[in-house]
Curated annotation (Swiss-Prot):
Keyword Metal-binding attributed: yes
Pfam families on file: Peptidase_M28 (PF04389)
Cofactor needs: Zn(2+)
Residues reported in the UniProt entry to bind Zn(2+) 1: H194, D213, D279
Glycosites: N186, N306
Protein name: Leucine aminopeptidase 1
Disulfide bonds: C328-C332
GO biological-process terms attached to the record: proteolysis
A GO molecular function held by the record: metal ion binding
EC annotation from Swiss-Prot or TrEMBL: 3.4.11.-
Amino acid sequence: MKVTNASLLALLLPAVSGRFVETGEPDRSILYPDGLPQPTETGEKYHIELSPGDTRWVTEDEKWELRRSGKRFFDITDHPDLGALRAMTASRKKSVFPEKPKYQKELKPFLAELSKTEMEDHLTTFTSFHTRYYKSDYGRQSSEWLLKQVRDTIEKAGADKHVRAEHFKHPWGQNSIIATIPGKTNATVVIGAHQDSINLWLPSVLAAPGADDDGSGTVTILEAFRVILQSEDIVKGNHENTLEFHWYSAEEGGLLGSQAIFSSYEKEGRDVKAMLQQDMTGFITRTLDAGKPESVGVIVDFVDPNLTQFIKVVIDEYCSIPYVETKCGYACSDHASASKAGYPSAFVIESAFEYSDNHIHSTEDLIKYLSFDHMLQHARMTLAFGYELAFTDFAALEKPDHSDSL
């Protein structure tokens, strides 16, 4: 049976005057004191890609129906040509990465500075927004709050003369955020997470705290960003490669924010050496309930195999839990936009995909289900990944006779 937003709203009217809060969770205030917003059904169509070459036109309601059924996709309406420049290029350099980590001594004091408290404090506020749906005013407000946290982090580190953070603007209201730590070259290493959340039943009305998806990834990379700025060499730009931390808008709508960014990078000819996505980093209950050891999930489909291998050796070196290989399908998070644009990308999630958080996209995606100890493991990996690749001499690695590369 097809269920429209209008019929759902009628069913839920008696409930929406209540509060979508749990005991012990942050107060999200009375919902819509000026009256319940009406969902709009304009009949506008969106062009989506469910797999390479498999495209169709759908309404917004149909987008959410697909998402509720577990389907992921690119919404290519605004960026139908993402990757076209790559396709026109006759040859492309093979991605190469260090065979093993080499900055253990330098990283040791910084790894000790990673803080569960910092992540929890940020996530508590971040989930207090009624929703972070990218078309909502709450989504705009949460993005502005997040940019302030990133800028405050830069200022507290005394790095504001060298490091900058800006909105990457979008027409739907919630902007993406890019923090840039310039290196000696314009070769760039990107670390990303998505800042938006969604309730797939009535995105513009129902609460979507999004603690795990992807509040957890958002604060994980923010904590890695905070600590990496404690490195004087990093702040002063003594590292080889520029580091960027991205917080994408509108991932839930079909990777919209990341597509806009990587489409821009592709057209500008930006040299992105690696992109790592952190989407959902805090839920381990189903893994443990299944009798499996706590681990991080390394995605192995639709990713760059050489970058993924490098991430495995980073986890082995810097994390105290193992990794498991797992798959998530086509267009399952923002790394897919980087990959489509021709850049080596990878994705690490909280567990094997089949044991990932089953509370997402609902009012129940709450902090109480998350493990900050587990998120700390993701932060360790993220910090080490960023630091190791910041100092990597890619020009030397890419020489045909170089032996210290994957």
